[in-house]
């Protein structure tokens, strides 16, 4: 006799097999076609699509004087913790313009002084904005490249026919648009061999010396503080050499260069070569760079963070935007280096920090604690520690709710979500077919149990994240049961043979054909359907949007287009939700979460004048790659031990995304482990501050649509 859990597993596998089989029998395509959408759903051409609204999300207002003070005295005080000269700009665009103007200034200066200027250039994705601005300056006649010599700071080896090339990329983004002489572009000779590598690298260094050395080096700070292809462990004395590329950087290269095959080795100038430049301009953008920027700027010089070895160079400038600067002391903890412009969020952050420093809960903090740790300004503003403590404690207390859709017939004055209307129409947008349960599985279950009309919209197919073994498993099972149920016809047998033969002969980096991508899509859809059924979401409320930008079959995705946005507009117009949940994981290393969020926000922008939008609240969740900082949390949904186990089970319904999932990132934990650890950590943080003790908490931040 089977145990209950065995029956459940059998049922799940059977449902998955039937869904996949039925798909190929009926040739049903669940991807909405834009040409078939009613006219009322298609955006008018007079509306300009806003495709990057997520970059305008400002969780906090940073006073300008923290990053761009009026005088050098204040700047010196702000930079007290910084060991590398850093310029912070509000936007990436502003930072790129500054780098371009600096490059033009130095090129003009050196060509005037000695007749030429020697540049060492990288072509990392962060440099593109600066080079675009530099081209604009060239077109305006403000810089001349006729006497400029350019050395490429790194190149792949060997150069594959269809593989990535730094020189090719640099031509696309800069060299083909300026008056640089072809003979003045120095790069790696593709005909060299490993046997002649050492001599060639020495000759490359000698050529730089013969040209008078590097006047200006321009490059990005990469993951974990890499510079050029100098990864963790590269010493300050490292020179031009052949290096082995790690798996993570190869994955990033594959994505940035839109290629599946990346060499395992490359030639790079060493840290010593880059430090020999008379001047250095380096850059990093976005909040996913914030942690490494803090290590580079405020940490000790350490070969484990190669960019930190630039400390001590007399003429180095690191240029970053506010996103990349958010972990620097002058931005995240300004009370340590200057007088503050206090607001509710900064006060909350300061008090949470003070609790961590003293080991006390909020309500036990004293005037002495505030004075001892440099927060005396708050005592002057509020009169006593007691007043500040009560203010922050109440704010945090009011974020906690067991009713994420609002508690009916209750006073909602101090609740994060309004009581009425009840029940609400709710749409949960999930970038991949598992992000909903990973990031807000407990909240999703609460919404269903509290009788809201919950819709789950899976924005992408997630098909490239299904391993070949997971797909073959279902074919092997269908091959066995096909004769039992009479669907072992010629069509099915031909498809099964072709698919299994393709997988056997598939090489690393080969793109799946369209049939296999559809099968993998069905696997993800079946898993999501089973998870939704487990939670209690109605079958008719499960939507597979399959946004076109994702369907390239490769890691590199297409650009967000109006077709993507119109699919979301149709769903929103059909449901007319009163509550929306959207991914806020803007630091997702694979980029899909950000694009999906941009698609939703673009749709909401186009629908901003709809009557139902006046009665709709939008909440952002995290959990797959990061968690909200407590000073930003506006709704905290507690999860009991039983609910946390239920959430784990709902995540485990996505079996293809367990141990052998292709894109787990650089975190060794499985997705359910990450989710539980983050949810428990949030609950422990609340408990440590003196609030109620919960097993876990899921956190949310409200998004205010741009009008």
Outline where the language-model segments fall.
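A conserved mid-domain beta-alpha-beta active-site/ligand-binding segment of alpha/beta enzyme cores
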Residues: 628-679
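Active-site beta-strand->loop->alpha-helix modules in alpha/beta enzyme cores, enriched
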Residues: 193-194, 357-433, 437-614, 648-653, ...
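Ligand-binding beta-strand-loop-alpha-helix segment within the catalytic cores
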Residues: 69-83, 143-216
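N-terminal glycine-/serine-/threonine-rich phosphate-binding loop
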Residues: 47-118, 412-413, 420
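ATP/nucleoside-binding phosphotransfer catalytic cores, i.e., glycine-rich phosphate-binding loops
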Residues: 50-60, 73, 278-374
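Cysteine-centered motifs
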Residues: 22-25
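Glycine-rich anion-binding loop/nest that anchors nucleotide
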Residues: 218-220, 256-297, 317-321, 581-584
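Class I SAM-dependent methyltransferase SAM-binding "motif I" and its flanking Rossmann-like core
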Residues: 224-271
């Amino acid at each position: 006799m089977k145990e209950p859990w065995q029956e459940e597993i059998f049922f799940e596998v059977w449902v998955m097999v039937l869904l996949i089989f039925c798909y190929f029998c009926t040739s049903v395509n669940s991807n909405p076609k834009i040409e078939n959408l009613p006219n009322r759903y298609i955006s008018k051409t007079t509306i300009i699509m806003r495709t990057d609204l997520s970059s305008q999300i400002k969780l906090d207002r940073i006073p300008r004087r923290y990053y761009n003070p009026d005088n050098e005295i204040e700047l010196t005080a702000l930079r007290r913790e910084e060991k590398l000269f850093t310029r912070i700009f509000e936007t990436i665009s502003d930072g790129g313009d500054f780098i371009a103007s600096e490059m033009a200034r130095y090129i003009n200066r050196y060509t005037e002084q000695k007749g030429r200027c020697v540049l060492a250039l990288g072509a990392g994705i962060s440099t593109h904005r600066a080079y675009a601005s530099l081209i604009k300056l060239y077109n305006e006649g403000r810089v001349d490249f006729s006497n400029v010599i350019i050395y490429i700071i790194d190149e792949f080896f060997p150069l594959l026919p269809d593989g990535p090339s730094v020189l090719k990329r640099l031509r696309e983004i800069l060299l083909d648009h300026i008056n640089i002489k072809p003979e003045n572009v120095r790069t790696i000779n593709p005909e060299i061999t490993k046997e002649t590598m050492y001599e060639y690298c020495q000759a490359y260094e000698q050529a730089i010396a013969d040209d008078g050395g590097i006047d200006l080096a321009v490059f990005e700070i990469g993951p974990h503080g890499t510079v050029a292809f100098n990864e963790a462990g590269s010493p300050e004395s490292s020179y031009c050499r052949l290096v082995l590329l790690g798996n993570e950087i190869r994955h990033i290269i594959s994505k940035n260069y839109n290629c599946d095959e990346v060499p395992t080795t490359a030639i790079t100038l060493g840290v010593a070569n880059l430090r020999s430049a008379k001047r250095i301009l380096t850059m990093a953008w976005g909040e996913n760079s914030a942690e490494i920027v803090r290590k580079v700027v405020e940490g000790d010089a350490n070969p484990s963070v190669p960019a930190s070895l630039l400390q001590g160079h007399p003429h180095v400038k690191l240029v970053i935007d506010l996103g990349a600067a958010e972990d620097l002391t002058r931005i995240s903890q300004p009370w340590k280096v200057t007088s503050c412009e206090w607001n509710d969020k900064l006060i909350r952050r300061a008090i949470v920090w003070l609790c961590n420093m003293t080991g006390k809960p909020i309500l036990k903090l004293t005037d002495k604690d505030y004075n001892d740790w440099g927060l005396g300004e708050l005592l002057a503003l509020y009169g006593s520690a007691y007043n500040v403590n009560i203010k922050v404690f109440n704010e945090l207390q009011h974020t906690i709710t067991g009713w994420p859709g609002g508690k009916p017939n209750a006073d909602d004055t101090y609740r994060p979500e309004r009581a009425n209307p009840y029940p609400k129409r709710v749409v949960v947008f999930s970038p991949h077919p598992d992000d909903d349960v990973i990031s807000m599985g407990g909240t999703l279950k609460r919404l269903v149990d509290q009788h809201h009309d919950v819709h789950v919209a899976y924005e992408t197919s997630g098909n490239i994240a299904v391993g070949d073994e997971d797909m073959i498993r279902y074919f092997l099972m269908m091959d066995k049961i096909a004769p039992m149920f009479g669907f072992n016809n010629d069509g099915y047998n031909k498809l099964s043979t072709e698919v299994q033969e393709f997988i056997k002969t598939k090489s690393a980096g080969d793109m799946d054909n369209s049939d296999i991508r559809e099968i993998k899509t069905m696997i993800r859809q079946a898993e999501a359907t089973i998870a939704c059924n487990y939670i209690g979401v109605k079958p008719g409320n499960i939507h597979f949007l399959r946004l076109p930008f994702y369907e390239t079959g490769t890691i590199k995705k297409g650009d967000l287009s109006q077709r993507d946005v119109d699919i979301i507009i149709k769903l929103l117009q059909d449901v007319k939700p009163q509550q929306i949940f959207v991914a806020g994981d803007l630091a997702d290393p694979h980029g899909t979460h950000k694009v999906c969020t941009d698609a939703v926000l673009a749709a909401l922008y186009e629908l901003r004048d709809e009557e139902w939008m006046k009665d709709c609240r939008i909440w952002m969740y995290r959990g797959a790659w990061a968690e909200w900082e407590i000073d930003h949390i506006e709704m905290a949904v507690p999860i009991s031990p039983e609910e946390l186990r239920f959430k784990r089970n709902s995540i485990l319904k996505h079996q293809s995304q367990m141990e052998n999932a292709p894109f787990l990132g650089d975190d060794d934990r499985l997705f359910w482990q990450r989710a539980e650890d983050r949810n428990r950590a949030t609950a422990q943080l609340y408990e440590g501050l003196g609030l109620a003790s919960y097993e876990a908490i899921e956190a949310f931040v409200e998004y205010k649509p741009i009008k």
